[in-house]
Amino acid sequence: MKLKTKAKALRGRLRVPGDKSISHRAVIFGAIAEGQTVIHGLLRGQDVLATIQAFRDLGVTIYESADSLIIEGRGFKGLKPAQKPLDMGNSGTSMRLLAGLLAAQDFSVQLLGDDSLSRRPMDRITIPLSLMGAELSGQGEKELPPLIVKGCQELRPIHYQLPVASAQVKSAILLAALQTQGETVILEKELTRNHTEEMIEQFGGKLSVAGKQISIKGPQRLQGQTLQIPGDLSSAAFWLAAGLIVPGSDLVLENVGINPTRTGLLEVIEKMGGRISYQAVDKDRQAATLKVSYSTLKGIEISGDLIPRLIDELPVIALLATQAQGTTYIRDAQELRVKETDRIQAVTDVLGQMGADIQATEDGMVTRGKTPLHGAAVSTCGDHRIGMMTAIAALLVEEGQVTLERAEAILTSYPDFFKDLERLWHD
């Protein structure tokens, strides 16, 4: 598709879709809790729809009302064997978290994914879940999907140190541990997003968190809840970037999630000199209204324990770096190479083809700015975040046309992305 270029300014107010990470977990916990769960603000992107369909295939009743999703929870013991493989689509979150949950069931299930998901390593979950007593098998050394999970109703508790900073791996172990007799202890390499821990407590479960150590005793029973999901900071990130780098822009984003384990991007914006302010802060719901406007940015270094708190925002941060004065270094981000695509390579390829001075390193990128961007024919590589990064980058293009292949990948997390762009466009 041809992307909009030569933006004069973006202005207006916007509500981004519900948080993808929280939406997945809300559906999962609603299904395994006892009683009804009502979810408001759910993201209805393709990834979350895959999670919903998986639980329908496992015998859970899920239906929609005008503004909510209603789940009739069956408890941990109420899931039924699926009559066919569960299709996770493009969603690594769905596959890894469901593998953890299903590791304690008394039936076997096959988890499938699309071409992109079928290249993502699952050994990071098969190893700890196998230590607990489940049988999991994928393809090759890295246990690539399809993944067969043969559950065990008498899992063993484990003490496990995560070899990578991954909220998905942590969550898979926690979902298994909730069904396991005894205490499981997880030690994180770096602090990662804590939505699963928060949701366990929200549904009436108990766990203990001390720094990077999480302890949980099972088995537990959970109770259905009513949830309000905030807007996704990872989706808001693209509009925050647009507001900062498109001259004359002034944007207000309402009801954006600001969980502290996710706000690394906001800290980076401030360090780069971006004009950003917080309004209507709701500490209980961890949400706020964010206001940004066009800014003069400077290059910085991004590394260490900040990386897990902005891992999904690094593509758009790389775009910001192309419009910042000086050099921006992104380090310690090798996890980007095993996302929906190799995001280090994809980001440097796309922005490089558009004229940016950007080089890939083994664990990140080096970007020298400020550089003008020009037209190019590029691809999302099937990755929604690469697609949205490119659409925002195209707004700066004054010469040439930007064409984007496989733009449908954006439907994974932001079905109305281009509609929202039209709303903010000012000639």
From Swiss-Prot:
Catalytic residues of the enzyme: D312
PROSITE patterns: EPSP_SYNTHASE_1, EPSP_SYNTHASE_2
Pfam families assigned to the protein according to its UniProt record, in alphabetical order: EPSP_synthase
A GO CC annotation given for this chain: cytoplasm
Keyword RNA-binding: no
Oligomeric form and interacting partners: Monomer.
Designated name of the protein: 3-phosphoshikimate 1-carboxyvinyltransferase
Organism: Streptococcus equi subsp. equi (strain 4047)
